[in-house]
Amino acid sequence: MNINIQDLKKKIIYRATYRGTKEMDSLLVSFTKKYVDILNDEDIICLSNLIDIDDENLYKYKQSLKTTVKINENKVTKLFRDFVYKKI
């Protein structure tokens, strides 16, 4: 499968912006804007997979709580879990 990484980055930013909960919108937009241009292609795919996870499980994962879905640990999930969101 041939993936256009630039198009995928645009989709990731869009999907991070329109989540469903304002809190997750803010958190994911801040996180993706910080990292989307410095991650390598493999990590961008991992970020896309992370964005596919529903808000509730993603929030639980961020808080180190038990989730109802399997989230594969990788560089991006570690960055997300360690990310400190600063509300402006």
Label the model's feature ranges.
Residues 2-88:
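Positively charged, polar, low-complexity stretches
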